[in-house]
Amino acid sequence: MTLAAAGLLSCTGTGQSAFDPASVADASGEVTRVEPLSWWTGMQTPLQLLVNGAGIAAYDVRIEGGQGVGVKARHKADSPNYLFVDVEVKPDAEPGTYYLVFSQGERQFKVPYEIAARAEGSVARKSFTTADMIYLLMPDRFANGDASNDSTPHTRERADRSAFFGRHGGDLQGMIDHLDYIAGLGATAVWPTPLLLDDEPEGSYHGYACGDYYRIDPRFGSNELYREFVGKAHEHGLKVIMDIVTNHCGTGHWWMKDLPFRDWIHQFPEYTGTNVCFSTNMDPNASRYDLDLQESGWFVPSMPDMNLDNPYVLQYFKQWAVWWIEYAGLDGFRVDTYPYNEKVPMSEWCAAVRREYPGFNLSLIHI
């Protein structure tokens, strides 16, 4: 058994309803997703794998392939289709391909997992500062460098330049093609709005309703092309700031049809939006009612509010942030809707990023 499409399957989740474990069929252990997609030696962040597959919670798991990498613990979720695996990567672990070996009685299958060596100087990377001139752009509206990906078979909203809130076709290739232009303006850093998959049926051009935290929207390009964009931006003397969202995902996120835990997102008997009173996040005299509604209410109906008080959610979010920095060679984050997050877990999230990259700056502005 191999990992289908290296964990980069198309999103299928569209529902908003509460998770009901009884509604999920128990099948025979096919792993469809392992996240993070890969990892590195010498990291400070503990590695906890999210494994998704029909009935996977019934399986034991061990790691083969070399010395210094092994399973520390496994944790079941509310859904039988998830398993969280704590992995130890010792300081002397060798980079290479390891195998997650899943077993249940006589049945056994393996899933490859890559542990790579960190890039030289990764920890000491320089970040953006107040000395930088930052160029903000919206990828879908900037430049269309590849018309073939304007609409794709596995994303719901198709390109329509006549629609004011529709997708217009801008992409990563268009951004790469115009790096000379951006640098020529005197910019020293570039901040694109979110590029991760947004699979909402309409209004997905802005990217703020994430459908997969480990996948660049195919209408913009690919993970590999994003990494190429960052590298070419650096060649032009431009730092790259990734725009990310920790407060919410989108209703089109792949996990929305089968949440790992009932409290993976904040749920209510009926739709409950945030009170948009983000001053409560910093007000020691704020009422608990106002603060809870600010932190737990959904930003809009298409953006389910993540529950960062759930330790598995928080660890998942720490890891995907670190993964993108290391994978793509990023220079900074802009964190959208920061005041809508739970304050204490987000302080832990910030600390995890800065522990891995002490000089890495986080812009917490909210527009």
Where do the protein language model's features map onto the residues?
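Beta-strand/beta-sandwich contexts
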Residues: 17-58, 111-125
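Immunoglobulin-like IPT/TIG beta-sandwich domains and homologous Ig-like subdomains
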Residues: 43-106
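Compositionally biased low-complexity segments at domain edges in trafficked proteins
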Residues: 125-149
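Substrate-binding/active-site clefts of carbohydrate-active enzymes
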Residues: 142-322, 327, 346-361
